[in-house]
Every structure is written in C-alpha cells, then in structure tokens.
UniProtKB/Swiss-Prot annotation:
Residues 46-60, 70-81 have a biased composition (Basic and acidic residues). The modification Phosphothreonine is found at T703. Expressed in testis. Expressed in the breast. This is Hyaluronan mediated motility receptor. The keyword Phosphoprotein applies. Pfam families: HMMR_C, HMMR_N. Signal peptide: none annotated.
Length: 724
C-alpha cells in the first residue's frame, strides 16, 4: 500500500493566541491539516453559548457600588502594604541601633585595652624603681664595707710601716752607737775643745725646738678645727640616713600604689562582666524582634486571606442589598454614632501627640543645656591644664626624670581629652538616635492619622453610595409595589434574601468591631513603643551621668596626683639646692686645708733637710771633739761620755716624740682625705685589694654631671700631687 505524502506544515495551527476552550466552533476554522483529521461533534455548542450569556449578564448586572467596594478593598491592601513598610523601617532602625551599640561595645573594649596597656606600663615603672632601689641599697652596703676595710687596713699598714721604720732606725742607731763608742774613746780629747762650739749649736737647736713647739701648738689648734669639721661631717651622714628613711617611705607609697592597681583590675573585671551582660540582653532583644517580625508576617498572610474571603462574600451579597434599604437606615444611624465616638478618640489621640511633642521638645532643650554645661566644664579644665603645664615646664627644667614623667602625664591627659571628645560624640550620636526615634514615632503617628482619615473618607464615600443606592431602591420599590400583585410568588424568595442581608449586616458589624480592636491594639503598641523609648532615654541619661561622675573622679584623682608630684618636685629641688650649698661650703672649707697640707709638706721637707745638715754638723763636732780629748785623763773622758750619753738619750726621746706627732698628723691627714673623697664621691685604688674586689671600680656614671661641680676633681688631684 502507498500512503499519500504529508504537506510541509504538519499540525500547523493558526498563529496568535487561541480562544478560550468552548468559545469557538471547529467548523468555522481553516481547513484541517495533518494525517489525522476528523470533525468534532456539536455537543459543547449550546453550553458554550449559555455560559457566555451568563458572563455577559453578570458583568452588566453588577452595580457601581460593588465596583467601589472592590476599589476600597484594593485601598485596604495598599494600607496593609504601607503598614508592612513601616514595620520594615522600624526593624531597620532597630538594626541600626544594634550596630551603634556594637560600635560602642568595641570602643569600650579598645578603652579597656588602653587601660591594660597603662597598667602594664605602671607595673614596668614599678619594677624599674624597685630594681633601682635594690641597686642603691647594694651600693650603700658595699660603700660601708669598703670604708670599714680601708679604715682597718690603713691603721694596720701605718702601724706595720712605723714598726719597720723604727726597727731599721734602731739598727742604724746601734751601728752608729758602736762606731761612736769606738770613735769616742779615741776622740774624747778633741771633743773637749769643741764643747763651746757645741754649746752654741745646742742653744741654736733649743731655739729651733721652741719654734717647733709653737708649730705643734698651731697644729693642735688645727686638729681641734678638724674635729669640729668631722662632727659636721657626721651630721651630714645623719642627714643621709634621713634620706634613706624617705626612701623607705617611698617604698610604702609604692605598696599603696600596688593595692590601687589591684582595685583598678577588679573594677575592670566588673566592667567586662557588665559588658557581657549587656551583650546577652541585646542579643535577646534582637531575637524577640525577629520573632515579632515573623508574627507580623503571619498576621499579614491571615489578613490577605480574610480580605479575599470578604471580597467573595461581598460580591455575593451586594445583589440582596438593593431591596433591603430599611435595615440599612438603622445601621446608618448606628454608624453615625460610631463616627462621633471615633472623632472623640481622634481628638484625644491628637492631644496625647501634642503633649508627647512638648515633652520631647523640653527633653531636647535639657539635653542642649547639659551639653553646653559639659563644654564649659571642658574649657575650664583645658585652661587649668594649660596653666599647670606651664608651671610644670618652669619647675621641671632641672630634673630630666621628672620631665619624662610630666610628659607621660600630659599624654595621659591628651588621651583623656580624646576620650571626652569621644564621649561627646557618643552623646551627639545618642541625641541623634533619640531624634531619629522621635521622628519615627511621629511618622508612625502621622501614618495612623492618615489611615484613620482614609477610613473616615471611605466611610463618607460609602454613606454617599448607600444614599444614592437608597434613592434608586426607593424608585425600584415603588415599581415593585405596583408589581406586588404580579410578584406574589416571589415573596418567599424576598424573605430569604432579607435573611441573607441580615447575616451580611451582622458580618459588617463584626468587621467594624475587628477594625476597632485592631486600632486599639495598634494604639497599645504605640504606647508600649513610646514607653520603651522613654525607658531607653532614661537609661542613656543615667549612663551619661555615671560616665560624667567617673570622668570627674578621674580628673580629681589626676589633679591630686599632679599636686603630689609638684610637691615632690619642689621638695627634691629644695634638697638639691641644700646639697649644692653644703657641697660648696665643704669645698670652700677644704680649700684652705689643702693649702695648709701643701705648706706642711714643704715644712716637712725643710725640716728633713735641716735634720740631715744637723747630723753632718754633729759628726764633724764629734770628730773634732775626739781629736781634742784624745790626750786628756780618763776621768774627764768618762764624765764627758756620760754627759754625751745623757744628751743623746734626751735627743732620742725628743726625736721619738716628734716622730709620734708626725705619725698622728699623717693619720689625721689620711682620715680627712678619706672623708673628702667620700663627700666628693672619689675612690682610690688600694693595692692590697688588687684582683680581690667584687665589683668593678671604674664604672660609668648613671646620671650626668651637673653645673657647678667642675671643681670636684681638682681637689683629689692636688692631694695626690701633694702626697707625691
């Protein structure tokens, strides 16, 4: 079998949108195309025509009131959309407030970190001060030990040297004595002729001895003066001990500062706990707001569904309202009474809004006044700080360590000023947030007023529509009364329609009650929101007051600390001036002693030279005396030798006395030199301590040399040259 060829366009329908099913005839279409083509039956034709007629009748029979009701329902849906937008705006505002609170929390955390850094710096300063105190105490202990050792060693070395010198002199004298005894036996005769010469020389030596005795008296007077000066030095040492007592007082102050630091740490921990609690509370509030948003969305969906149902019911019941205008007149009177009630409620709400607006204005004025007061206080504090800084700059030029502390305090004050500026910015932010909240409340109130005005307008339009419909219905009623005899059969249907209208009226009453309840709920919500915002405002005011009190306390504490530091600087400057004056007095007093020591050394050398010349003369006299006495009798020789021995013993005793006096003088001079070195802070190297000392001697000075102390190194150099 062979099939016919299909055309190119298979199953090709006409272009364009097809009509609705059942609204067209198959026969009126174009020629059928495709392999399968058959003619449909005409079973759907009558139903289609009937449905079209019904739809046309429905469209024509709908009155203008029903169309207006539909427009009112669209307006209600628009109102619901507006309410949702307003709620979304509120949610955004709350989220912005949450962001601002998070920023505040971050700022507080940064402030806590700064406080911790300051505490760490204070602890470091404390440790450095304690280390410096420990090193100073060690140095004092070492100096006392070195002084005791030097005293003991100088006394031992002096005795040993004197013993050695005396032993050597005794040996020499013994040798000389033996030589003299040998020469005396041979030279007694020559000595008798030279006795007169020796007597003259003895008289001259006696005169010299008298001069030496006068010098000894002057030396004793100088010793008395030196004792008085040593007493003064002991008084200075007592003052140094008083300074050590002050160091102990400073240690006690440091302990008190440690306790204060512990208290500050506890306060910081409490602040952290309060911050954590605030964060938890805010998170809970955010969760509650999210839950409220979900509930509002659900309510929106319910309202939309209800509106749809109401639209359907209203479309079904509007045809029955035409014949039953009598009941609607009664309902109209009731609605007029309700309108009066609504007007009274609106007036009350307007009065409340005006009172709230006045309260907000008064609150804003109070905030502005407080802000001005804060600015004036800040200006005063800044002026005082400038004055204090000028005073500090004048007072702290002498001591560098105190300058560094003042700089650190100035930096802390700058940080506090920055904090105050930040707090002012926070105040401005809080005021801005408050104004935003008030604006939002005003917007909500305006939206509510607009919604109420729209409701009243809708109600008035509905009244006008009902009046026009009532007039139409009156005309229709007159025509119906004329046709009442003819329409007797339709009386039962009319009664059913009356019952339906009554049910519809009841539903309208329910709708009005629902609207009233919703308006009451919204009013309560507005009141709750206002109360919550007022509570937040009061909380912010309390927080600001607390922060102001804290800042005032901090400023007072810092002013007290500054005053204490100024007092300490004044005391230190006074002590420095005292020590400078004492040092200058000591230096002026020690200058003549140094000159006297130089003069004593010159006299000592002259005496030693004279002693050598006298010994040479004695030797010559002895030789000549021995030559003279060589030929005389033994008795005379013996007598002369006895006299010479007596004179020799006297001379030896005088020489020993003079040596003892010289040794005492040397000891006193060494003691004075040691005390001078202690006062001037100069150390001399002791050879007995070589390679045995614990700490190095030539260490670098920690503090630089001050003005006026350039002569402190001349005295020891001159002393060293004089001892050389």
């Amino acid at each position: 079998m062979s099939f016919p060829k299909a055309p190119l366009k298979r199953f090709n329908d006409p272009s364009g949108c097809a009509p609705s099913p059942g609204a067209y005839d198959v026969k009126t279409l174009e020629v059928l195309k495709g392999p399968v083509s058959f003619q449909k039956s005409q079973r759907f034709k009558q139903q289609k025509e009937s449905k079209q007629n019904l739809n046309v009748d429905k469209d024509t029979t709908l009155p203008a009131s029903a169309r207006k009701v539909k427009s009112s329902e669209s307006k209600e849906s628009q109102k619901n959309d507006k309410d949702l937008k307003i709620l979304e705006k509120e949610i955004r505002v709350l989220l912005q407030e949450r962001g601002a609170q998070d920023r505040r929390i971050q700022d507080l955390e940064t402030e806590l970190e700064k406080m911790e850094a300051r505490l760490n710096a204070a602890l470091r300063e404390k440790t450095s001060l304690s280390a410096n105190n420990a090193t100073l105490e060690k140095q004092l202990i070492e100096l006392t030990r070195t002084n005791e050792l030097l005293k003991s060693k100088f006394s031992e070395n002096g005795n040993q040297k004197n013993l050695r010198i005396l032993s050597l002199e005794l040996m020499k004298l013994r040798n000389k004595r033996e030589t003299k005894m040998r020469g005396m036996m041979a030279k007694q005769e020559g000595m008798e002729m030279k006795l007169q010469v020796t007597q003259r020389s003895l008289e001259e030596s006696q005169g010299k001895i008298a001069q030496l005795e006068g010098k000894l008296v002057s030396i004793e007077k100088e010793k008395i003066d030196e004792k008085s000066e040593t007493e003064k030095l002991l008084e200075y040492i007592e003052e140094i001990s008083c300074a050590s007592d002050q160091v102990e007082k400073y240690k006690l102050d440091i302990a008190q500062l440690e306790e204060n630091l512990k208290e500050k740490n506890d306060e910081i921990l409490s602040l952290k706990q309060s911050l954590e609690e605030n964060i938890v509370i805010l998170s809970k509030q955010v969760e509650d707001l999210n839950v409220k948003c979900q509930l509002l969305e659900k309510e929106k969906e319910d309202h939309v569904n209800r509106n749809r149902e109401h639209n359907e019911n209203l479309n079904a019941e509007m045809q029955n309202l035409k014949q039953k205008f009598i009941l609607e007149q009664q309902e109209r009177e009731k609605l007029q009474q309700k309108e009066l009630q609504i007007d009274s409620l609106l007036q009350q709400e307007k009065e409340l809004s005006s009172s709230l607006h006045q309260k907000l204005c008064s609150f804003q004025e109070e905030m502005v006044k407080e802000k001005n007061l804060f600015e004036e206080e800040l200006k005063q504090t800044l002026d005082e700080l400038d004055k204090l800084q000028q005073k500090e700059e004048q007072a702290e030029r002498l001591v560098k360590q105190l300058e560094e502390e003042a700089k650190s305090r100035a930096e802390e004050l700058k940080l506090l000023e920055e904090k105050l500026k930040g707090k002012e910015a926070e105040l401005e932010k809080s005021s801005a947030a408050h104004t935003q909240a008030t604006l939002l409340l005003q917007e909500k109130y305006d939206s509510m007023v607009q919604s109420l005005e729209d409701v009243t307008a809708q109600f008035e339009s509905y009244k006008a529509l009902t009046a026009s419909e009532i007039e139409d219905l009156k005309l229709e009623n007159s025509s119906l009364q004329e046709k009442a005899a003819k329409a007797g059969k339709n009386a039962e249907d009319v009664q059913h329609q009356i019952l339906a209208t009554e049910s519809s009226n009841q539903e309208y009453v329910r709708m009005l009650l629902d609207l009233q309840t919703k308006s009451a709920l919204k009013e309560t919500e507005i009141k709750e929101i206002t109360v919550s915002f007022l509570q937040k405002i009061t909380d912010l005011q309390n927080q600001l007051k607390q922060q102001e009190e804290d800042f005032r306390k901090q400023l007072e504490d810092e002013e007290g600390r500054k005053a204490e530091k100024e007092n300490t600087t004044a005391e230190l400057t006074e002590e420095i001036n005292k020590w400078r004056l004492l040092y200058e007095e000591l230096y002026n007093k020690t200058k003549p002693f140094q000159l006297q020591l130089d003069a004593f050394e010159v006299e000592k050398q002259a005496l030693l030279n004279e002693h050598g010349a006298a010994q040479e003369q004695l030797n010559k006299i002895r030789d000549s005396y021995a030559k003279l006495l060589g030929h005389q009798n033994l008795k005379q020789k013996i007598k002369h030798v006895v006299k010479l021995k007596d004179e020799n013993s006297q001379l030896k005793s005088e020489v020993s006395k003079l040596r003892c006096q010289l040794a005492k003088k040397k000891q006193s001079e060494t003691k004075l030199q040691e005390e001078l070195n202690k006062v001037l802070g100069i150390k001399h190297f002791d050879p007995s301590k070589a390679f045995h000392h614990e700490s190095k001697e030539n260490f670098a000075l920690k503090t630089p040399l001050k003005e006026g102390n350039t002569n402190c190194y001349r005295a020891p150099m001159e002393c060293q040259e004089s001892w050389k």
